[in-house]
Amino acid sequence: LPESPDINDKWPSVAESYLPDGLREFRDYPAVSLGWMMYVGMAVAQCWDEDWQIYGNMPDLYAYLRDKEGFDLMDEYIRRTVLRLKTPAYDETEQLVQQCAERTLSALRREPLEPGTKEAFDAYVACLRQLYQMGAAVQLHRLNYRMENLRLC
């Protein structure tokens, strides 16, 4: 899967800013709490492709994305405005994120974790990171980036 060190390096600041929103939503909407991070990964990849000199220097890229239309509508904002998706890609992306979030949630629930513990928190953050990276990879692939083996020598 395509990846970028710049996008990966943005993870700590994205996660720190996202966690208060994600944790608040997890109780009532756990799949949303997970899935929205995949959208954020897609948006960060799109920003990386468009103008990383600007977006890469934003101190809180997540808040920039969220505050455009709010947390609840962030998925639609990212698909419509950031990624500029039209039907059918708009709907297919929604289905992909929903499936990934639900499968991740199912795997998380199968873990022998006590809610409210450090271990449960760490597992949640690990899931968010994977979804962020998956979202970035999906968008980089959509933008026709491909990973290739390099021959040195």
Predicted region positions:
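Intrinsic-disorder/low-complexity detector
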Residues: 1-153
